[in-house]
UniProtKB/Swiss-Prot annotation:
EC class (word): ligase
Gene: purM
GO MF assignments: ATP binding; phosphoribosylamine-glycine ligase activity; phosphoribosylformylglycinamidine cyclo-ligase activity
Pathway assigned to this chain's UniProt record: Purine metabolism; IMP biosynthesis via de novo pathway; 5-amino-1-(5-phospho-D-ribosyl)imidazole from N(2)-formyl-N(1)-(5-phospho-D-ribosyl)glycinamide: step 2/2
Protein name: Phosphoribosylformylglycinamidine cyclo-ligase
């Protein structure tokens, strides 16, 4: 190098032109998510959002999440179009279990070398997730960081803010002996347990793209986007007395259900009330995974569990199934001082 050599940001591995091209590519899909409360357009230093006027005592609810090592599987299989839906789902589903309506979403996309096609596919998926949940994609950060990530590997994180009427917050405090538990079916493993999924693929020597399961490649089952329950659950909350909702994520049945149970109550799950989707049977068999570990790592076909009074069950099931959910009675709440908060029998 001579003294006359002029270095640029691009020489250092950061392509501003590629970043600008990405913004141009995604503007259209982002615009489709816009709610009337959004003030200003994409590209400002901060996103402005006016609270909906229908709330008398609005309480903001926030959440952040990622998609774990499902992202590694998506990168290995070069399938980036649905991982954004997963990202939104993990955040908005956590909000709605508290009764909150998701309002707006932001994303963080970090990579070693920005590939516009890949990033566009991911962010288009994020926009689709926002459409499914009725929230606005108001901004995000795309960080190209050479030396921090290998090649075109990337990571994503999501941030969501919602709102709930103070008097209508769902916190599990109303759960009581005799309440009935309703399950909402999942679309697959959702976004949890993928380090175990990848280990099972490794030890079994299985190629998920050529292995058939239920008439389609195993990869389709494993990369099926996380189901977004927001619109169905918000309508349910509006019409039925819901006592608690648990989103079955990391920790499965054993750890997520107790998060919404008051002291001296126990959830009793009827294992005969549903059949595991085939992908979970395959994972258990291929990995020789014990039953307790399956229920601790995976949702086993159950994305959410809702507690409500017994007289409301028929109405709730009819409403949920009419909205396209696979809903069924999965158990009951019992009074108990046992340390075992969840029983599966």
């Amino acid at each position: 190098m001579t003294d006359k050599t002029s270095l640029s940001y691009k020489d250092a591995g950061v392509d501003i032109d590629a970043g600008n091209a990405l913004v141009g590519r995604i503007k259209g899909v982002v615009k489709k998510t816009r709610r009337p409360e959004v003030m200003g357009g994409l590209g400002g230093f901060g996103a402005l959002y006016a609270l909906p006027q229908k709330y008398r005592e609005p309480v903001l609810v926030s959440g952040t999440d990622g998609v774990g090592t499902k992202l590694r599987l998506a990168m290995d299989l070069k399938r980036h179009d649905t991982i954004g839906i997963d990202l939104v789902a993990m955040c908005v589903n956590d909000l709605v279990v508290q009764g909150a309506e998701p309002l707006f979403f932001l994303d963080y996309y970090a990579t070693g070398k920005l590939d516009v096609d890949t990033a566009s596919a991911v962010i288009s998926g994020i926009a689709e997730g926002c459409l499914q949940s009725g929230c606005s994609l108001v901004g995000g950060e795309t960080a190209e960081m050479p030396g921090m990530y290998h090649g075109e590997d990337y990571d994503v994180a999501g941030f969501c803010v919602g709102v709930v009427e103070k008097s209508e917050i769902i916190d599990g405090s109303k759960v009581s002996d005799g309440d009935v538990l309703i399950a909402l079916g999942s679309s697959g493993p959702h976004s949890n347990g993928y380090s175990l999924v990848r280990k099972i693929l490794e030890v079994s020597g299985c190629d998920p793209q050529t292995t058939e399961l239920d008439g389609k490649p195993l990869a389709d089952h494993l990369l099926a986007p996380t189901r977004i329950y927001v619109k169905s659950v918000l309508e349910l909350i509006e019409k039925v007395d819901v006592h608690a909702i648990a989103h079955l994520t990391g920790g499965g049945f054993w750890e997520n259900i107790p998060r919404v149970l008051p002291d001296n109550t126990q959830a009793v799950i009827d294992e005969s009330s549903w059949q595991w989707p085939e992908v979970f049977n395959w994972l258990q068999t291929a990995g020789n995974v014990e039953r307790h570990e399956m229920y601790r790592t995976f949702n086993c076909g159950v994305g959410m569990i809702i507690a409500l009074p017994a007289p409301e069950v028929d109405k709730a099931l009819a409403l949920l199934n009419a909205n396209g959910e696979n809903a069924w009675k999965i158990g009951i709440i019992k009074a108990s001082d046992s340390e075992q908060r969840v029983v599966i029998e």
